[in-house]
């Protein structure tokens, strides 16, 4: 969405759950902006295609995959996420869906669950999996509440300061070390 803001010069698209913690409110806000400015799904897909991975992200993900099953729990939408997932080597992505009109406008969004990230963690745990979670925003707090261990990665100071009980890292190496430290399989 920040790339949509950059492409369209409409700064309001740069708001994230860091700014509007309730994801439903944020998406309602974004859809109203899209309608107001006549933007379509293709505008968002084009922005998604322009995104580059953060430096070191793919190397980190590949190293972590050597020891862990990796699932991306995201508040994005399948209709938007494909370019980024391709760059990440298509990890398992659990996210939401959009309703698209015949003219390509985004009519609505469909959340899989109000607290989809938390529900996914609980589902994996119900099958006997131990879950370590990492995120950078308010919408990740729901999964930290139930994960066996949660970590902030590159979170804004405001969020990590508000939640000092959650370890915060600014490097993938430190996060990888924390994952390994909390693993039951790696010694």
Model-derived regions, located:
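Substrate-recognition "cap/lid" segment bordering the active-site pocket of phosphatases
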Residues: 79-131
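Short acidic-hydrophobic, aromatic-tinged amphipathic segments that line or gate anion-handling sites
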Residues: 94, 166-175
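Alpha-helical segments flanking ligand/cofactor-binding loops in enzyme cores
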Residues: 62, 122, 141-142
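Acidic, Mg2+-coordinating phosphoryl-transfer loop and its flanking beta/alpha structural elements
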Residues: 70-75, 129-170
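Short, well-ordered alpha-helical microsegments
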Residues: 78-82, 140-141, 176
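Alpha-helical substrate-recognition element adjacent to the catalytic core
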Residues: 1-97
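Short, charged, surface-exposed secondary-structure boundary motifs
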Residues: 101-108, 160-167, 177-182
């Amino acid at each position: 969405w920040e790339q949509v803001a950059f492409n369209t010069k409409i700064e309001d698209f740069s708001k994230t759950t860091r700014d509007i913690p309730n994801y439903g409110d944020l998406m309602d806000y974004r859809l109203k902006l899209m309608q107001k400015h006549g933007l379509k799904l293709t505008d968002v897909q084009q922005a998604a295609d322009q995104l580059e991975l953060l430096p070191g992200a793919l190397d980190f993900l590949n190293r972590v995959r050597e020891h862990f099953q990796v699932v991306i729990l995201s508040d994005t939408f399948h209709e938007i996420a494909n370019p980024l997932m391709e760059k990440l080597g298509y990890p398992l992505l659990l996210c939401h869906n959009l309703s698209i009109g015949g003219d390509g406008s985004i009519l609505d969004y469909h959340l899989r669950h109000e607290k989809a990230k938390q529900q996914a963690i609980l589902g994996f745990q119900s099958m006997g999996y131990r879950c370590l979670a990492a995120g950078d925003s308010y919408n990740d707090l729901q999964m930290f509440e139930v994960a066996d261990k949660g970590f902030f990665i590159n979170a804004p100071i405001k969020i990590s300061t508000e939640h000092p009980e959650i370890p915060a890292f600014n490097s993938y190496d430190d996060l990888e070390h924390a994952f390994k430290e909390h693993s039951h399989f790696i010694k």
